[in-house]
Regions:
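Short secondary-structure boundary/capping segments
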Residues: 22-34
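Microtubule-binding structural modules
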Residues: 36-40, 58
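Short, flexible helix-coil linker/hinge segments at the edges of structured domains or between repeats
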Residues: 30-32, 40-43
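P-loop NTPase motor domains
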Residues: 2-3, 8-10, 14-25, 52-300
Length: 300
């Protein structure tokens, strides 16, 4: 019963409690434990499974991106839960509509304080997202067509010889036609990619409309790419909690090859999720969760 009802999660900062070979009998024999060797420097190592519900969580992203309470957290909240973003990023047509709306708003409604290449910065962010996910295979072609086709004449945008000031409907139709040529591979979009896309689109939307200033949310946004690359190396999204249903009593999470900043974040995410899971699903108090954080002063 002890083996069935007790769960031990050991956060191992320095690689003292698990070694990557079949003779790993540290603490208990290998058959009684699950081992995760996480790494922020290599992309072919283990990834710790966390459920989708944890990814769609404001606290998760606030911790990861170091969001400030007053301005950055509300921006993150709208990025995660705004209905149009959540629903439209599920489909190819929805994503194209979001991209078109963002571009048309930048080009036709953006304030004069916007960078003149703000639309290109937006496409560059989609290009970066594609580099790590392959969700937009021809984004470079679309970006180059818009970059070469758009010109300004005394503050008036011209797209492939169509002046917005003279023929606004034709201008927008041409813009939509170019956006429609974007190829979207939804099979490459996991929960991390979807949320990063929501944050990108929301950032350019709220800056263009003047709801937020770059000074307030820019620092958070600038952390997005590096944190996204790190988090996708160490966590895998699963719809079924493989750790909870796993009957092995000991889980060792080896953080020896994880950078200092992520060493602080990973234990917070793991501990928060499993503590809340057991609190909610263990009302009869028959199961026991034991979280052991070795070298805990590293994150306290």
């Amino acid at each position: 019963n002890f083996q069935k009802n007790a769960k031990f999660i050991l956060i191992d900062f320095n690689g003292e409690y698990a070694i990557e070979n079949d003779n790993d009998n540290i603490i208990v024999e290998k058959a009684l434990k699950s081992r995760f060797f996480l790494s922020t420097s290599k992309s072919d190592k283990d990834r710790f499974p966390i459920p989708e519900s944890e990814i769609n969580d404001l606290t998760f992203w606030s911790i990861l991106l170091k969001a400030t309470e007053q301005t950055q957290k509300p921006f993150l909240n709208s990025s995660l839960f705004k209905k149009t973003l959540v629903e439209h990023t599920k489909t190819e047509n929805g994503i194209k509509a979001l991209i078109y709306n963002t571009l048309s708003t930048i080009l036709t409604q953006g304030s004069r304080n916007l960078d003149k290449d703000f639309h290109i910065f937006f496409l560059d962010e989609l290009f970066k997202l594609n580099n790590s996910s392959s969700v937009f295979p021809n984004i470079k072609d679309v970006r180059n067509r818009l970059k070469s086709g758009l010109k300004t004449d005394y503050g008036n945008w011209i797209l492939e010889n169509i002046k917005h000031g003279e023929k606004p409907n034709e201008f927008l139709f041409k813009l939509k036609e170019i956006v429609q040529s974007l190829v979207i591979d939804l099979s490459k979009q996991n929960s991390f990619v979807k949320i990063r896309l929501q944050i990108i689109i929301n950032y350019f939307d709220v800056i263009t409309k003047g709801y937020y200033s770059k000074e307030h949310i820019g620092p958070l946004y600038n952390r997005l790419e590096s944190k996204f690359n790190e988090i996708t190396k160490v966590f895998a999204v699963t719809n079924e909690d493989k750790i909870i249903i796993n009957k092995k009593p000991l889980i060792v999470v080896n953080l020896n090859d994880v950078n200092v900043e992520m060493k602080k974040i990973i234990p917070l995410v793991i501990c928060k999720y499993y503590y809340e899971f057991f609190k909610k699903n263990n009302l009869d108090r028959e199961n026991y969760l034991n979280i052991i954080v070795d070298e805990a002063h590293n994150i306290l």
